[in-house]
Amino acid sequence: MQLDPSKFVAEGLTYDDVLLLPAYSEVLPREVNTSTFLTRNIRLNIPIISAAMDTVTEAGLAIALAQAGGIGMLHKNMTIQAQADEVRKVKRSESGMIQEPVTLLEDALLADAFNIMKENGIGGIPVIDADHKLKGIITNRDLRFQKDMTVAVSDVMTKTNLVVAPQGTTLTEAAAILQGNKIEKLPVVNKDGVLVGLITYKDIQKVKNFPNACKDEYGRLRVGAAVGVAADNIDRVTALVNAGVDVVTVDTAHGHSKGVIDMVKAVKALYPHLQVIAGNIATAEAAIALADAGADAVKVGIGPGSICTTRIIAGVGVPQLYAVYECAKALEGRGIPVIADGGIKQTGDMVKAIAAGASSIMAGSLFAGVEESPGETIIYEGRKFKSYRGMGSIEAMAKGSKDRYFQDETDVVTKLVPEGIVGRVPFKGNMAEVVYQYIGGLRAGMHYCGAASIEELQKAKFVRITAAGMRESHPHDITITKEAPNYTR
């Protein structure tokens, strides 16, 4: 047997192995620009993405994160229709003008109106005829004292003195109309009276309340969704596109594989304008292969996550900081962003990931404990926790993530080889507070490095440290009596 003398490629470093060197600075933390590219064509206002995990990201968390300036990736452990519906919930949750509002025909019953309002969490529905011309509007106030729910909506709706706005009305003009007429919903019609949209007072207020929100060209919150490489995933992509998804991520444990490359090519061939993220990878060769296949961003991380056991079970992986650097270096000049997925334990880890070349970070455990995550709330020994599991756990694979680990050939749970575990994380409160602290840490790091933008932070230098250096970096020789909101060991 002839052993390759270059078998040991390099010494891999991760976040706890380094610190960033401080540099001359002319910017204060509040002055830095935290916007970044998620993909070639999508820009985020903060470099944070929530992981496509079934205890992390569904519509509720995706809405909250997009309002903060990031983006959520909806997990795929659900039916195609259910995932598309989650996309619609996000896209309808906030809009400059709702492009395709929920409507009813004139002969619909009050029971239909009641059920649709309850299902979609809305307080009013435009009523149209067969030609899509606006005939009236019915609100929850119209239903409040109705006993006979078999009455047609046309008998109860507001149809006279209906306040509408012409196509092309700005949000500022719409706000004046809404306030002047003391109404909450403003149908928008074209010159033929056809309904083309709906502007609500609630949406205008959200624009004021969340000025940093990540939105598409129509003023809707952005959202992404995971797809796999199984046979039905082109159908899944089609359903997601029809629902208005902004970006899909071809989500597997080993992105440098034929199935992933073929899926990226297939999706880009069908939907050339759809932004596609591909992963997960950990080498320069993988980054180049996915970029050549047409990926608009690559996701880096094999085994760094707190609930991942891939490195232990399979013996495979690359320390995360080194992996991010290698992939970013390989794609330099190609305009394809790198996403650092996993291993973020402290706010400083995010700063280090970006300095190593990432344009954004993806996190699961960071968000698993927040109010908006879909994980089960658990009370244990008087403390509040939320459930959190890896998509490589047996429980998650049994629910649909088998193809992420290329084990979709079996339906026998006992034949699955897990690469993740199930656990719980402390409850953290609402997501906005967690994101505020993380972005605060990022701003501080940028200030120390003299970086006014994410692009400038990527030029920062590292110093390698010892285990003693890391111990020195943490609070030491003291008993903490009052915990800080942004620090834990």
Language-model segments: residues:
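Short beta-strand/loop segments at the ligand-binding rim of alpha/beta enzyme cores
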Residues: 43-48, 96-101, 216-226, 267-282, ...
